[in-house]
Swiss-Prot record:
Belongs to the GTP cyclohydrolase I family. HAMAP family: FolE. This is GTP cyclohydrolase 1. GO terms for molecular function: GTP binding; GTP cyclohydrolase I activity; zinc ion binding. It is an enzyme of class 3 (hydrolase). Keywords: GTP-binding, Hydrolase, Metal-binding, Nucleotide-binding, One-carbon metabolism, Zinc. Homomer. The gene is folE.
Amino acid sequence: MENFFNQFFENIGEDKNREGLKETPKRVQELWKFLYKGYKEDPKVALKSAYFQGVCDEMIVAQNIEFYSTCEHHLLPFLGNISLGYIPKEKIVGISAIAKLIEIYSRRLQIQERLTTQIAETFDEIIEPRGVIVVCEAKHLCMSMQGVQKQNAIIKTSVLKGLFKKDPKTRAEFMQLLKS
């Protein structure tokens, strides 16, 4: 890692021995271990260990769960929030498990579209609800800091499964709950 940073500093015209940079390779290495720890965790295990048999058959919504991730194209952060709604069949999941699922997938190099899909598909596979919807809203620093340099753009993605995909009334109820 140190060789990588020495080359990087040289390529941008920086002095690797400058006081503020001497420990940077070590600091960044520790930071990257933290930022990308999602590769070492199994999202399915996180969900499997946190559900229980339930009697609820109405919609459950976890709204505005904050996340940050790293764009795989430019290695710059994107951050925002994710809302997940589901209608249980037999299993109800602990709310913190939803946040853990989001954290595991977001702590990897990502694109927002895949992040949204992975969360929805894993939740659908493990919890087997009658329907699940995931809505992700994010601000991408790769769009703000370079290229088109649009600082206020927000990208929204969604994935719908089961009743949320088949029934417009179910979708509308979820959207109404997000607004209230």
